[in-house]
Amino acid sequence: VGADLLAGSLIKNPGGGLAKIGGYIAGRADLVEKCAYRMTAPGIGAEAGASLNTLADFYQGFFMAPHTVSQSLKGAIFTAAMLEAVGMTTSPHYTDQRTDLIQSVSFQTAEQMVAFCREIQAASPINAHFAPEPAYMPGYEDDVIMAAGTFVQGSSIELTADGPIRPPYTAFVQGGLTYEH
């Protein structure tokens, strides 16, 4: 198993919930160098990079990421156990080995799914007073609902829930900077 080149977002797990922008590229040195020249300019490559007071967030995010990810995993396990205890279907099961932070939760109706996502939003530290509505999103055949009252826009390491409004009605719960949340 391996890859010649990979790329990712720092507003996800590696940023520890602190990086507000940024990404990373890793892999074979020759390919990383080509990416660096494509992202900047020939002759500049990786010699220039992040600035404007972003480096502290990146470094602190990398430092905090292992703890933040462990908190999020604990939250996903707790979510699965709690919802299964009241008869809901989740995947993975709370005792399953995990390879991701995403916890899927299945509902009988679209209304139940929307209500669940609204409760996630209501428990969020940012924009808790908003009620998410299913809406069209490019790339999806069906309307999508997204609950994400996050400090960093697009950050799925923070507590979020989203999914397309179609059978099987499944919301994908992600993140949680802290287990307590």
Question: Where are the model-predicted features located?
Answer:
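Catalytic PLP-binding core of fold-type I/II PLP enzymes
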Residues: 1
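Receiver (REC) domain switch/active-site residues of two-component response regulators
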Residues: 4
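Active-site C-terminal subdomain of aminotransferase-like
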Residues: 8-113
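Conserved C-terminal alpha-helix-loop-beta "cap" of PLP-dependent enzymes
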Residues: 84-181
